[in-house]
């Protein structure tokens, strides 16, 4: 769409003649150009912002020769599209069949409300999850500490002390039994020796008896 076509469409929408539509378009463009030239910005809510941007000095290259060329600092006109304009072009917002395509304070306010509500809900949910998980972790860390500090080592220590005592008493009993057995073994040969000695004396009596008979 060029300027002439724009004027034709504007003439139909306004229901006026072509001269008035042409004057309206030219006055709008003239006002924007003069404001941006001064350094001001022209904001049309929902549509966009016309502004001036400052570019610093830089080094560029000539595309034909390839030589480096120094570019002086300059000012460049720029246009930033508005939120509603972007939404309509991207398809996020429906374009109405009749009436203005961009309304003042409709798309922008709705977008801001959605942006504010969504992070708030996520933050509250994250805070609740953190609050519920934190005590559980503390309890999990405390419970093993108590068990390890009081019950488990005490039982093991008692068992460790009792079992050697039993083993020692058993060992003492075994040694006592062995000692008594050894004493009995040493005493038994003495009796045998005592029994054998009278056996040697018996033949002497027999000899004396034989002598008396003779």
Swiss-Prot record:
Name used for this protein in its record: DNA-binding protein HupB
GO biological process, one term: chromosome condensation
EC number from the UniProt entry: 1.16.3.1
Name of the gene this protein is made from: hupB
GO molecular function: DNA binding; oxidoreductase activity; structural constituent of chromatin
Region annotation (Disordered) ranges: 100-214
Outcome of gene disruption: Essential it cannot be deleted; upon depletion growth slows dramatically, nucleoids decompact, gene expression is altered.
Stated family: Belongs to the bacterial histone-like protein family. Long actinobacterial subfamily.
Low complexity composition bias: residue spans: 102-112
Organism encoding this protein: Mycobacterium tuberculosis (strain ATCC 25177 / H37Ra)
Residue numbers bearing the Phosphothreonine modification: 43, 45
Recorded superkingdom: Bacteria
Biological role stated in the UniProt entry: A nucleoid-associated protein (NAP) that plays a role in local chromosome architecture. Binds DNA non-sequence specifically; in vitro phosphorylation of an N-terminal fragment decreases DNA-binding. Stimulates supercoiling relaxation by topoisomerase 1 (Top1, topA), at higher than 80 uM inhibits relaxation, has no effect on DNA gyrase; the effect is independent of DNA-binding. Increases the intervening strand passage activity of Top1 that occurs between the two catalytic trans-esterification reactions. Does not bind ssDNA, probably helps condense chromosomes. Has ferroxidase activity, converts Fe(2+) into Fe(3+). Binds Fe(3+) but not Fe(2+); prevents the generation of hydroxyl radicals by the Fenton reaction and thus protects DNA from damage. May function in iron storage.
N6-acetyllysine: residues carrying this PTM: 3, 72, 86, 103, 116, 133, 146, 167
UniProt feature, compositional bias: Basic residues: 113-214
SMART domains noted in UniProt: BHL
A GO cellular component annotation in the UniProt record: cytosol
Activity modulation comment: Two trans-stilbene derivatives, 4,4'-[(E)-ethene-1,2 diylbis({5[(phenylcarbonyl)amino]benzene-2,1-diyl}sulfonylimino)] dibenzoic acid and its methoxy derivative 4,4'-[1,2-ethenediylbis({5-[(4-methoxybenzoyl)amino]-2,1phenylene}sulfonylimino)] dibenzoic acid, respectively SD1 and SD4, inhibit DNA binding with 50% inhibition at 20 uM for SD1 and 1.7 uM for SD4. SD1 and SD4 have minimal inhibitory concentrations of 400 and 800 uM on strain H37Ra respectively.
Free-text comment on this protein's domains from its UniProt entry: The N-terminus (residues 1-108) is stable, binds DNA and is phosphorylated in vitro by PknE, PknF and PknB. This fragment binds DNA less well when phosphorylated by PknE. Residues 1-100 stimulate Top1 and physically interact with it. The N-terminus (residues 1-40) forms an intertwined dimer, while residues 44-83 form a beta-saddle which probably contacts DNA.
Xref: PROSITE patterns: HISTONE_LIKE
């Amino acid at each position: 769409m060029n300027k002439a076509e724009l004027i034709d469409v504007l003439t139909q929408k306004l229901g006026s003649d072509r001269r008035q539509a042409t004057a309206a378009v030219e006055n709008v463009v003239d006002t924007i150009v003069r404001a941006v030239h001064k350094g001001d910005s022209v904001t049309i809510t929902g549509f966009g912002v016309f502004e001036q941007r400052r570019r610093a000095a830089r080094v560029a290259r000539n595309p034909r020769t390839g030589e480096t060329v120094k570019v002086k600092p300059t000012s460049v006109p720029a246009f930033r599209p508005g939120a509603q304009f972007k939404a309509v072009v991207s398809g996020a917002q429906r374009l109405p069949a009749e009436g203005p395509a961009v309304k003042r304070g409709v798309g922008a306010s709705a977008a801001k409300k959605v942006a504010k509500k969504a992070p708030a809900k996520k933050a509250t949910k994250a805070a609740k999850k953190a609050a519920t998980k934190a005590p559980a972790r503390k309890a999990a860390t405390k419970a093993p500490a108590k068990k390890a500090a009081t019950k488990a080592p005490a039982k093991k220590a008692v068992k460790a002390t009792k079992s050697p005592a039993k083993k020692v008493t058993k060992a003492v009993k075994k040694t006592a039994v062995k000692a008594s057995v050894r004493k009995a073994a040493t005493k038994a040969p003495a009796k045998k020796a005592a029994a054998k000695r009278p056996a040697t004396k018996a033949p002497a009596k027999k000899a004396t008896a034989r002598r008396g008979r003779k």
